[in-house]
C-alpha cells in the first residue's frame, strides 16, 4: 500500500473513532474528572440549550467554570442535545458562564465535541453567527486562564466558539476542521463519496494540527480509542489539565493575554 493511501486510511479511521457513538461525551468527563459539579442553565434571553452544559466545578479544592458541547449517549438523549449541534442560546449561555468566571477569577475549562453549530432557520433568526463571533471576541480577552480540549469532533466555528484558549488540547483520535470531510468533498469535488480522501487532504487529525502548532498537545487515548477505557481517558485528561494550570500559575494577566493573542496571530505563519 502506498504511503498516501496509508495516510488517507489513517485519517478516515480517526474520523470514525471520533464519531463513535460509544465515545465518552463532555458530561461523562465532567462528572469523572471533577470532585463536584453544579450545572447552571439558560442564556437569560431565550432559553436553555441542552447541547451545551456548563456550570461550576471543584477539583482539588480549586473552583473552575466548566463548559462542554455534549452529544447524547443514545438516540433519545441525542435528540434532546440536538446531536451536539448548539443553538445560539447555547453559545450565549457559555458566554454568560465565561463572564461569570472572569468576575470570580475562576479558570475556564471547555470540552469540544460537535459536528458544527446548528444551521436551522430558527438558529439563524436568533443570531447564530453573531453569537459565535461574540464568543471569539470575548474569549480572546477573557481575564482568566482558558483551557480547551477537543474530545471528539471539532467542527467549524461551532467548535472554535469554545476553543479560543491559552492551551488547546486534542485527544489522540479526535478531529478539528473548518467543516466535515463530507461537506468538503461535496463543495470542492461535487462528490460526497470522496469523504475518505477529503479527510486526508484537509489535515484534520490531532497529529496534523500539532505539526502546524495549531494545538498545544495531543492527549494519548487507550488502545482502540477513548471508548475502550473511558476511566483511563478521564484520568489522562485530568492529569493534562492540572499540568497546564501548573504551567500557567504565576503568569501575570498581561503576559497571559498577550501570549493568547499571539498564539492565534501566529497560526498563519505555521501553515
From Swiss-Prot:
Give the pathway. Answer: Lipid metabolism; malonyl-CoA biosynthesis; malonyl-CoA from acetyl-CoA: step 1/1
* Gene Ontology BP annotations: fatty acid biosynthetic process; malonyl-CoA biosynthetic process
Gene Ontology MF annotations: acetyl-CoA carboxylase activity; ATP binding; carboxyl- or carbamoyltransferase activity
Q: Which UniProt keywords apply?
A: ATP-binding, Cytoplasm, Fatty acid biosynthesis, Fatty acid metabolism, Lipid biosynthesis, Lipid metabolism, Nucleotide-binding, Transferase
Catalytic activity reported? N(6)-carboxybiotinyl-L-lysyl-[protein] + acetyl-CoA = N(6)-biotinyl-L-lysyl-[protein] + malonyl-CoA
Q: Domain (CoA carboxyltransferase C-terminal): give its ranges.
A: 1-247
Q: Tell me the enzyme class.
A: transferase
Q: SUPFAM superfamilies this protein is in?
A: ClpP/crotonase
A GO-annotated cellular component: acetyl-CoA carboxylase complex
Under Enzyme Commission nomenclature, its number is: 2.1.3.15
Q: How does it assemble?
A: Acetyl-CoA carboxylase is a heterohexamer composed of biotin carboxyl carrier protein (AccB), biotin carboxylase (AccC) and two subunits each of ACCase subunit alpha (AccA) and ACCase subunit beta (AccD).
Query: What role is this protein assigned?
Result: Component of the acetyl coenzyme A carboxylase (ACC) complex. First, biotin carboxylase catalyzes the carboxylation of biotin on its carrier protein (BCCP) and then the CO(2) group is transferred by the carboxyltransferase to acetyl-CoA to form malonyl-CoA.
Family under the similarity heading: Belongs to the AccA family.
Q: What is this protein called?
A: Acetyl-coenzyme A carboxylase carboxyl transferase subunit alpha
Q: Which organism is it from?
A: Clostridium perfringens (strain ATCC 13124 / DSM 756 / JCM 1290 / NCIMB 6125 / NCTC 8237 / Type A)
Amino acid at each position: 500500500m502506498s504511503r498516501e493511501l496509508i495516510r488517507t486510511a489513517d485519517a478516515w479511521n480517526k474520523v470514525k473513532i471520533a464519531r463513535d457513538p460509544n465515545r465518552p461525551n463532555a458530561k461523562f468527563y465532567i462528572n469523572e474528572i471533577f470532585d463536584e459539579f453544579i450545572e447552571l442553565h439558560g442564556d437569560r434571553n431565550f432559553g436553555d440549550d441542552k447541547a451545551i452544559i456548563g456550570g461550576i466545578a471543584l477539583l482539588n479544592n480549586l473552583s473552575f467554570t466548566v463548559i462542554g458541547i455534549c452529544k447524547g449517549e443514545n438516540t433519545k438523549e441525542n435528540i434532546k442535545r440536538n446531536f451536539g449541534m448548539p443553538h445560539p442560546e447555547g453559545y450565549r449561555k457559555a458566554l454568560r458562564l465565561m463572564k461569570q468566571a472572569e468576575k470570580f477569577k475562576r479558570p475556564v475549562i471547555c470540552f469540544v465535541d460537535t459536528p458544527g453549530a446548528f444551521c436551522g432557520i430558527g438558529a439563524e433568526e436568533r443570531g447564530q453567527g453573531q453569537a459565535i463571533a461574540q464568543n471569539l471576541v470575548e474569549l480572546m480577552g477573557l481575564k482568566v486562564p482558558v483551557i480547551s480540549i477537543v474530545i471528539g469532533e471539532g467542527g467549524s466555528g461551532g467548535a472554535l466558539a469554545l476553543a479560543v484558549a491559552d492551551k488547546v488540547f486534542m485527544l489522540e483520535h479526535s478531529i478539528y476542521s473548518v467543516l466535515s470531510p463530507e461537506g468538503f468533498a461535496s463543495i470542492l469535488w461535487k462528490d460526497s463519496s470522496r469523504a475518505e480522501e477529503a479527510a486526508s487532504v484537509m489535515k484534520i487529525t490531532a497529529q496534523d494540527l500539532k505539526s502546524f502548532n495549531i494545538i498545544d498537545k495531543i492527549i494519548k487515548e487507550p488502545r482502540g480509542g477513548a471508548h475502550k477505557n473511558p476511566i483511563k481517558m478521564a484520568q489522562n485528561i485530568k492529569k493534562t489539565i492540572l499540568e497546564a494550570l501548573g504551567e500557567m500559575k504565576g503568569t501575570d494577566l498581561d503576559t497571559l493575554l498577550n501570549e493568547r493573542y499571539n498564539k492565534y496571530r501566529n497560526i498563519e505563519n505555521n501553515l
